Structures are given as C-alpha cells and as structure tokens.
Regions:
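N-terminal secretory signal peptides that target proteins for export/translocation
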Residues: 1-20
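Helix-start (N-cap) detector for alpha-helical repeat units in TPR-like alpha-solenoids
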Residues: 40, 72-74, 108-110, 144-146, ...
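Terminal, low-structured helical/coil segments at or just beyond the last alpha-helical repeat
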Residues: 40, 176-210
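Hydrophobic face of amphipathic alpha-helices that form TPR/SEL1-like repeat modules
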Residues: 42-50, 62, 77-84, 113-120, ...
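Short helix-capping/linker turns of helical repeat alpha-solenoids
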Residues: 50, 68-71, 84-86, 91, ...
C-alpha cells in the first residue's frame, strides 16, 4: 500500500469502506446468480413434467420463465413449443431464435434443431452450408440425429463437398450411437421397407443388416 493511498484512506474513509464492502457485494452477486440458476432448473423440471404429460398450456409459461433466465434446456424446449404450436401460437421465427440461444450454450439437441431449421427453412431462409455447420456441431456432441443428417449431407453433397467415405463414417456413428442408435436403425429400416432408394444406400454404408 503506497503512502499516498494510506493518506487518502484516512482523509476519505469511504475509500476503505468501499474496499471492505466489495468482497461482500461479489459474494452476494455470486449467491444471487446461483439462486437464479437453481430457480430456473426447478422451473424447468416442473415444466418438463407438464410437457411430457402433454399439458402444454401449463408448461409453456414455466418454460418461458426458465428460458429467459438462461436455462439452455428450457430454451430448446420453448423453441419446440413455438415450432409446433404447443401451449402458444405457432411462431417459427421465435422457435428459430430460441433454438439459437440454446445452441449458443453448446446444447446438442438445439444445435441439431438449428441445423434442421436451416435445412428446411423453418423461421429462417434455407441455407445448406449453415445446416452442415450446425449438424457438425451437434454430431460432434454425440447427437445421433445430427450424425445421420450429416451423413446424408456428405452423401448428397448438400452444403458440403460429397464424400462417400465421410458419409459412411457418420452413418456408422449414428447407428452405433449408445443413446439413440437403435432409433436410427429403425428409421433406416422403415424407409427401406417403404422403397426409399437412398435408405438402401445408407443401410449399406452404415453396415446395417436388412
């Protein structure tokens, strides 16, 4: 502590008081942030239970409050509400915006959803390059749907240079995904049964038995 600073603190005690109060203010701020996060998580869990029970009207306001507090899962599910018109008037632009907020927090489901919005033109203009960008992020975060879609992008050369080897690699990751691989396999087999020629190619590249 310099002599000048020491003299100033004697002449102006408010300086010293400020220094003493600063750690307390930081502690209170930290506590407030933690409490807000806990409240958001509690709201999300309540909302998810209602959402899963298809009580969208009651789920929506809780999801919105949690989403506004920055809860990434709530932001994603709020996007679903807006996209599908669940508990609120359908609004694809709002859906895209909320998916984007969640995706920015590295939430794989939201990253996939943003990619799908760019692929299908949901709430934004179609942009296959952007779709690939977000599918890649979600695929690298082990999202099976994104791995499957990324494989299709490489297979068809949509938004990226066609590459059969990379397509096969992503299809294999999708069908071997620990969480959702079985669902992807079921999807491929269903499409093959319906006579989808692309699905037959995907089945072969993924190494899935008929």
């Amino acid at each position: 502590m310099s002599m000048t600073f020491a003299i100033n603190t004697i002449k102006h005690p408010s300086i010293w008081e400020g220094l003493v109060r600063l750690p307390l203010l930081l502690l209170l701020l930290s506590f407030s942030v933690t409490l807000s996060a806990q409240n958001a998580d509690k709201l999300y869990k309540e909302a998810k239970a209602l959402y899963d029970a298809k009580d969208y009207t009651l789920a929506f306001p809780k999801l919105k409050t949690a989403a506004e507090k920055g809860h990434k899962k709530a932001q994603y599910r709020l996007g679903r509400c807006y996209e599908k018109g669940r508990g609120v008037t359908k609004d694809e632009i709002a859906a895209f915006q909320w998916y984007g907020k969640s995706a920015a927090q590295d939430y794989a489901k939201a990253q996939y959803a943003v990619g799908n919005c760019y692929k299908e033109g949901i709430g934004t203009a179609k942009d296959h390059k952007k779709a690939v960008e977000y599918f890649t992020k979600a695929a690298q975060n082990d999202n099976a749907d994104a791995q499957y879609q990324l494989g299709k992008c490489y297979l068809k050369g949509k938004g990226i240079t066609a590459d059969a080897k990379k397509a096969a690699s992503w299809f294999k990751k999708a069908v071997n995904n620990e969480k959702d691989g079985k669902d992807i396999i079921a999807k491929i087999r269903k499409k093959v049964a319906e006579g989808d020629e692309d699905a037959k190619t995907i089945m072969k590249l993924a190494g899935v038995k008929p």
